[in-house]
Amino acid sequence: MTTSRRSFLASLAGTAVPLLGAPAGLIRGIDRSILWHGRETGKTWFHPRACRIPGARPTLLMTLQQITGSDVFHHVHWSESRDLAATWSEPRPIPGLGRRPTPDGLEEGTCDVVPEYHARTRCVLAMGHNVYYDKTGKLARPDTERWPVYVVRNSAGRWGALKKLHWDNPEASAMYTSNCSQRVTLENGDILVPLSFGPLGRRDRGVCTVRCTFDGVDLKIVESGNVHRNPVKRGLLEPSLARHGVRYFMTIRAEDDRGYVTASSDGLHWAEKQPWCWDDGEPLTLSTTQQRWLPHSDGLFLTYTRKDPTNLNVPRWRVPIFVSQVDPRKLCLIRSTEKIVFPLEGDGVHHAESVPFLGNFHTTAISPRQSIVTTCETILKTFGGNTLQARIEWSRPNRDIRDS
């Protein structure tokens, strides 16, 4: 069973955004659609993240999982599209990515999975991290014994066994994670993976990047870079990477009403982080939320949520989702380029309790002319919500993406 493009257009007629009157730029338009109607069915597909598998007819592969409460995630599934995200197949479970009992009476699962295609081995590497639940189904051990886990889908479409990414750094004795994070694959097949980590006895986490080898079966850390810290609450979280031109960029979630950005020439050794600001120097006000890169060969963009007059009472200001172009030299956002990817629905000031909020999203370049942003609504009373997709139309082709 698939979700048809006809139903997309019928359910969201009039949501194409031509951006008339906006300054000439790379983003020509944004077209929004519903992938799965979780508000109606009660089955909410969360953490939708896709990657592109090249070929004569490229395939898109998405990982996603159901959510039934705050951080209460279930079996990780996969879906695919063979028509550039016009339709998606019914989600199917990935073997081994459900819950499993632990010796101390908990259940261990997997969440926050990000799939990415690895050209050298023609595999999809799907990486998330482990998560624990007690007998009542509530989140347990949120800050200890957490680590990255991954599965590999080979070129024949078969999923391998769940594996742990091992790291013997004593500064990561409590936990180390690469959850929801964008990675960068190098020309030689090595992979740059961003990590957030901390030792036992210390609450705030640091971030760094590691270089991994990958042979299509095993992922191994062989080198790590310098560490950034921010000793406020849980510190620095959920770093994501992008490469633009000859430089690497990392965006970082934080818990001091800021997000941070830094740049590197090799993807391992990073300049001092700085808060995300507008090009006039005013810092963005964020609330421990993710940011995601939206790369294009002619410009680097960031997708994010932030404080806005329309969302003052929405938890963590998690909607709207915005996009802006980055000034890669100054490491700031160009205010005049900001656009709304997913708008706020309802009244975020006087009736915020009824506003579906977002905040867990991902970007995927699907063709030279298009990228997509995928996310899922959360409605607090029911944890129901629709799974959403925004199609970004580029005014110029993205030369980093080949048709086949």
Label every model-predicted segment.
Residues 47-49, 112-114, 180-182, 238-240, ...:
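Conserved beta-strand position repeated once per blade in WD40 beta-propeller domains
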Residues 5-9, 115, 148-150, 293:
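Generic low-polarity alpha-helical segments
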Residues 23-44, 52-108, 117-176, 184-238, ...:
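Beta-rich carbohydrate-recognition and catalytic domains
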Residues 320, 357-360:
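Short amphipathic alpha-helical surface patches that serve as generic macromolecular interface elements
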Residues 1-15:
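N-terminal secretory signal peptides and thylakoid transit peptides that target proteins
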